[in-house]
């Protein structure tokens, strides 16, 4: 879990230029596998994601979830143009950071 939390912090710094706080919960009442808002708090739900999700390290699924959640820095609405554009920007910045060896 520490590896994923550290990666999430680095990815946030590189893609949304924001320092975040990473927390973990384990509850059926928390919708989805994770949540993030413009306040900078990312919460992973161990109950929804399962232990194996964390044990596999940094996978495509981890990156996919982080891109989705970090899009909420710019809009809470999954159907808005702002959210769509945010996902595009985050993906492009992620690529640039990986290409330059920063991630």
Q: Residue ranges of each PLM-predicted region?
A:
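Walker B catalytic acidic pair
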Residues: 69
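Short acidic catalytic loops
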Residues: 66
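Active-site scaffold of zinc-dependent metalloenzymes
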Residues: 23-63, 73-76, 81-95
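Auxiliary, metal-adjacent structural segments of Zn-dependent hydrolase domains
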Residues: 1-41, 95-103
